């Protein structure tokens, strides 16, 4: 399962930063195929994507000069912080470890992108991560191995869609 996640996130990283953003990226199969249906794989994928969204958003707060980008980044940090606190309160997993593999590479690329290109790269990464999160949650909600987790996955989808819609509206410059 870890290998499948690594391979799919590698494809996500390559597509996200090697290709200029276009609406067809989401249709190009850059995400996990198939999405994990066992709880462990699902949880690992969700934790990794969430960590990328937060870490890249912290970077956006220091690198972006655009108010809309900074506001979105703060929203991501705040929302994911609340979710993480809620998970800890009910004994959920802690995603405190460093990013690995493709998501780490995506974050490193974002750290090193020239300032003039930062907003566009951040936008691409957020769109890719949220599209992947929607796919992972949707697949698990439909066919996941644990009913309680399936309900949580389903409940998360409208929030992820809202974040994805907001990411699409971020400025590229």
PLM feature spans:
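His/Met- and acidic-residue-enriched segments that coordinate or traffic transition-metal cofactors
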Residues: 2-12, 16-173
């Amino acid at each position: 399962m870890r290998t499948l996640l690594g391979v799919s996130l590698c494809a996500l990283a390559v597509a996200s930063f090697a290709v200029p953003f276009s609406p067809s990226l989401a249709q190009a199969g850059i995400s996990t195929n198939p999405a994990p249906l066992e709880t462990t794989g699902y949880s690992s994928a969700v934790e990794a994507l969430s960590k990328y969204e937060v870490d890249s958003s912290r970077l956006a707060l220091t690198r972006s000069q655009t108010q809309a980008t900074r506001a979105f980044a703060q929203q991501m940090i705040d929302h994911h912080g609340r979710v993480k606190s809620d998970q800890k309160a009910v004994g959920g997993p802690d995603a405190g470890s460093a990013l690995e593999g493709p998501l780490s590479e995506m974050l490193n690329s974002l750290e090193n992108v020239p300032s003039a290109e930062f907003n566009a790269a951040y936008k691409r990464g957020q769109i890719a991560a949220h599209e992947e999160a929607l796919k992972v949650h949707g697949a698990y909600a439909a066919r996941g191995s644990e009913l309680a987790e399936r309900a949580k996955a389903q409940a998360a989808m409208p929030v992820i869609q809202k974040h994805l819609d907001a990411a699409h509206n971020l400025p590229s410059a």
